[in-house]
Structure formats: structure tokens, C-alpha cells
Amino acid sequence: MSEIATMAQGEAGAIGPGRLVLVVGPSGAGKDTLLQLAQAACIDDHDVVFPRRVVTRESSAAEDNIAMSPDEFRRGIDHGDFAVHWDAHGHSYALPLEINDDIRAGRAVVVNVSRTVIAALRQAYANVVVVAITAPPDVLAQRLAARARHSDGNIAERLSRSVEDASAQADVTILNAGSADYHSRQLVRVIRNESWRE
């Protein structure tokens, strides 16, 4: 697997004062489920933003991405439409440039990203919080098999990426092996910069 991250050009200094909450974790960890529940919990909080990622594949039912063809994606890069973009698992992903305006306005921006972009984003943004969402390997395998998304590719290969790898650069780790409602409440507390333990 090849993953490459590229930041938008022309930004000077770390962007703030808002927070960039990066959600990372292995396939099948339940990131999209927890993000959907957290977004619903924050629906009336105008200081929390959940931008849609741009992806060069069709979105699944659990995702709210903007699907683009590879050619459209390249044009977006050429036009400077993305704050950051990266390639992973044979697809291209990006975050819209507008997240910078939200962060400058003091909002918390919550995004699902590849862990390969963490270092670059920590340099580009003043207040980055990395939340690793993970689950035991047997739970990951069950979820991936049940999901059976064509773009998941080789499930065994995806599972070989260590669960610990997702947590290596994390500020907070959520072991998503129980109630999605409970774990989404943990995520909301992190997003709102509150204590996340019950």
C-alpha cells in the first residue's frame, strides 16, 4: 500500500485558533459510525464542523463523502481546492480548503483521515488532536467481512496493519468494542475539549 500526503501551498504558519480533530483507525474500527453519532450530537453546535471528505470512489451507506473521478480530483488539486490530499488503498482522498476558514474562526473541525497525514497536519495547524478509534482484531475482521465493500480489497492485508499503529500518534484512543452510543459520547467530549472518561 502506498500513502502520500500533500498540503495546500501558500499557507504561512500554523493555522488556528480552532481545533483540528483528526479521527484515525483501522478499517472496520467503526470510525464512520462514531462520527455520524457525534455529528448528530453536535448538530446544534455551530462551533463544531464535520466537513465532507472528497474521495475517488463511491461512498458507502455509512459515509458522507463527495465522490469524484480521478480526473476531477486532479483538477481540484490543480485549482488548489484542497487543504490536504493523500492516496491510500488505491484511492485519493482530500479535505476541502474551507476547513482553514473554520479553524481561523475558532471552530473545531472533525475529520476522518489517514494516519500518514498526521505529522503534516500537526505542522500546518496550531491545535491538532488525534483520536484513534480501534477495536480488537477479531471485531475488525467481523466488521470488514460484514461490510464486504469492494474497495476494502484484501481483508487479511488490511487486518495485518497493526491496531497499535493507529494509536501510535494518538492523543486519545477509543476502543470501540462496546456500545456505539457510549463511544460516540467519548468522541463528543474530545471534540468539545471536555474530559472524555466516565
UniProtKB/Swiss-Prot annotation:
It comes from the Bacteria. Its EC number is 2.7.4.23. It comes from Bradyrhizobium diazoefficiens (strain JCM 10833 / BCRC 13528 / IAM 13628 / NBRC 14792 / USDA 110). Pathway: Metabolic intermediate biosynthesis; 5-phospho-alpha-D-ribose 1-diphosphate biosynthesis; 5-phospho-alpha-D-ribose 1-diphosphate from D-ribose 5-phosphate (route II): step 3/3. This is Ribose 1,5-bisphosphate phosphokinase PhnN. Keywords: ATP-binding, Nucleotide-binding, Transferase. Disulfide bonds: none annotated. ATP binds at G25, P26, S27, G28, A29, G30, K31, D32. Pfam families: Guanylate_kin. The gene is phnN. It catalyses: alpha-D-ribose 1,5-bisphosphate + ATP = 5-phospho-alpha-D-ribose 1-diphosphate + ADP. InterPro entries: GK/Ca_channel_bsu, Guanylate_kin-like_dom, P-loop_NTPase, PhnN. PANTHER family: GUANYLATE KINASE-RELATED, RIBOSE 1,5-BISPHOSPHATE PHOSPHOKINASE PHNN. One of its GO terms (biological process) is 5-phosphoribose 1-diphosphate biosynthetic process.
